[in-house]
């Protein structure tokens, strides 16, 4: 059995850790509320962008824009969104596991794909396993602005536009609820027919100048940038929710450990007192 001093030291250190995890839980909860608000505020913009895409691309059956035209896939592109920090449970690990599983199932060697990474966790994981990273960005704000991730989005889009890849897939953790997030993948390039016809098409009766192809060349890259940014906002909400849950579980576990250690301390203290009383009684009896 551990000594009273050792048990007391463990109780004190666990209490300090509990204070830290409780504070981190509260911080993550606050960040989650802001992330949910950011995602909600971004939705109307995406709806309007989809309306514009529907009006321009959906109204024209013979559009030939590269972002709307599937081509033979010889090289795939993967944009994976992970966190910069730890203490978020299996948030990054689940996304990376899904990515690696799909890459190993689809490709024979690294010449068949390119990887773009957001987040230090993803960079470290892939480098340690020998994967080549085409482009990476770390130290992304907890509440990212569009400007803060625009370079990443542009690089991924340029890979497709310059035909270095023939498709772009994004891997991330989709925020379902505070208690649930789902490792998800989706193809963002080429844009599917569904993507170009999701809007309500309120602009379809307009005449476009100079022509629809010229307009598509401007708004389609902006639309894909928006898809990527919206996905990053979704992933950030998932990250904050996962970290909040992880810190709550850590706090609960610390509370349980403190209770167990306190019980062990009291038992050890009682045993020590009992032994001291026994020794005193035994000494008194010997003197008689």
Curated annotation (Swiss-Prot):
Keywords, comma-separated and alphabetical: ATP synthesis, Cell membrane, CF(1), Hydrogen ion transport, Ion transport, Membrane, Transport
Protein name according to UniProt: ATP synthase gamma chain
Lineage of source species: Bacteria, Bacillati, Bacillota, Bacilli, Bacillales
InterPro entries per the UniProt record, alphabetical: ATP_synth_F1_ATPase_gsu (IPR035968), ATP_synth_F1_gsu (IPR000131)
Family the UniProt entry places it in: Belongs to the ATPase gamma chain family.
Membrane topology value: Peripheral membrane protein
Gene: atpG
Main subcellular location of this protein, as a coarse class: membrane
Positions in coiled-coil regions: none
GO terms classed as biological process: proton motive force-driven plasma membrane ATP synthesis
Pfam families: ATP-synt
Function per UniProt: Produces ATP from ADP in the presence of a proton gradient across the membrane. The gamma chain is believed to be important in regulating ATPase activity and the flow of protons through the CF(0) complex.
Lineage top rank: taxon: Bacteria
Gene3D superfamilies, per the entry: 3.40.1380.10, ATP synthase, gamma subunit, helix hairpin domain
Regions crossing the membrane: none
GO cellular component: plasma membrane; proton-transporting ATP synthase complex
A molecular function (GO) term: proton-transporting ATP synthase activity, rotational mechanism
Localization (cell): Cell membrane
Binding partners and assembly: F-type ATPases have 2 components, CF(1) - the catalytic core - and CF(0) - the membrane proton channel. CF(1) has five subunits: alpha(3), beta(3), gamma(1), delta(1), epsilon(1). CF(0) has three main subunits: a, b and c.
